[in-house]
């Protein structure tokens, strides 16, 4: 591969390198063919239930909308249907482009700080509002609306109450509890000036491999259908009440329409391959009570139905949702989801609006999308009637919510009432929700409830770990990278146990590794999945693998210590070895900020009442096990859950895994070797092999934290040479690119490069793109410290990489001498600063 020279990048190197903007190295990328529409993805609205409009048209509101639309320019109309992310837009942009909405994505926060204080959120809300209401000639002033993923409380803001994720709330089967959680969440959003949540998720999840399983209430429509109305009424208030959508209430969103939980293989943003009747009967029922409760926005799913993206399916968006169901609010897209429609890109997609989308979620693509959409409106390829209808729907919701007269967010009810954020009443509600969400799966010999006056060992990496306890969508998109100080109004499970035991005069010892000096009366081991969100949580199977905590449980059992396992997870998983090694086993899901609720249950302050919302698998490859299936054969059935009075013994279970342990799909290199399905290749460009000889380049094991957990790569300078991670089969990284994931390397430079160096991602013959590295590596060599390099995948895409068929996730190439040690390479949600690509 002949690599062109590129401009050097500026770099200030510390242990976490901050990268400046860089030039792109581009090699021609072929475009993947676009699939045509499928006849089986054409819904017949007459086959769907019909419903009357929730509200009769309000003549006063409709007249006002008529007046506004008549006074609006074409540019202002186009701006109203575009939503930009606060990480890529300024208040001045909102004013200049007449933008109708902003959002904060999972990794977007005021000032770019994941732990920005609540006051900064309120100040940002005021700034965006003020910009939208600033006089602009004769154009009408239209307030901006700010949307946020408040999916388990106001989870993006430090100090907010964090409720259990939906999977746990599904186990509670308590609609009144759900209503009260909606009310509390709405108030906490109002405190920070936000007026629109992208919740509730009404997914019916049919395959637990899906990375969003924990966002669904269950595997059947039953629970989501019973929860939709009370949760929406908790968030929005009740239709007819004076504070509907106002005062302590906000605007809710029913999502993701439709079939997001039914994709083939549980693949996030995948394809729901099924007949229309199955799509209708399994996945649409929760939307009807949501509409009856007056939900004002519906988010369109990333997924496809029989090969056609929902963002482009007119038969469902317009034919069913708007015409058959008489929905008069607006349809909002998901993160650049319109760009996945056949024939579209993130910056150009009139087809999605024609299909029925009313507001594009265009986080970083908004400016170019504005330009192309305006051109479509001027040319007539986006009919003005469709544009006006989308604008009418958005204005209708803003008028119903009283936003035109509401004043700046800090002046509205609850604005700036920071003492209520994570306040005692809301925390008590969250603790109640934890108590109701836990499911007792095993209780051999009636070990539970425990006596708090005993000598208790608390172990496992989840015991004192609020990051793990709260899961994804917590302060960051993936829920990772947080610290204890980021949770001022929270209690870890260990802290809850310690408080109970201390109050009862007992003794509690925390040791994640399970060490003790005096043999405990009982051990509580808390462990489970690390946080994830969306496709980052997709798995090839549902087997849980954790050699360290399994060994701990077995050692405690061998020592004759009764053991309680508390399992933290976003899905039902195969855990047979852990069940065998435990005397009692509690499915705690992702309980949120109130670890004391777990302690309450372990010590019998309340009896277990949670029932499984998902069937529990008996094998690691039993990924789609749903009640009602012809071959239904779970380990624990849908609706199972013990109480203290039940006989909780469990026969010894088979421990053989159905397949190899699931690999980390984002791991390119780590622990001294390439990730699963990948190879480290070396040699001259075009002549790579696993062992080319040391003439041009060599690789040897190196130590960082453990023996040979890294690799030393040494280029001799005798000629052009490449070190590359190569896929066994081309990888589709398009979802990861759209999701703002990054290629993150950790390396240490022992000898600065003597010639230009390029970091390249490849997608086949004459298809690659990348960036110059020489300046960065030269600076890193001066420090002799471990350096983190993070480059957003979208930068490689901009450089010409076809992200749907990546063959070489990264390669480092130079014709000069270079000596560096590579510790890890991953595709991740970045843990720190990333470079900004031009």
Give the location of each predicted region.
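N-terminal beta-rich core of secreted/periplasmic extracellular enzymes
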Residues: 33-258, 282-366, 374-407, 432-447
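Gly-rich Lys/Arg/Thr-decorated short loops/hinges at beta-loop-alpha junctions or inter-strand turns
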Residues: 161-165, 207-212, 261-271, 297, ...
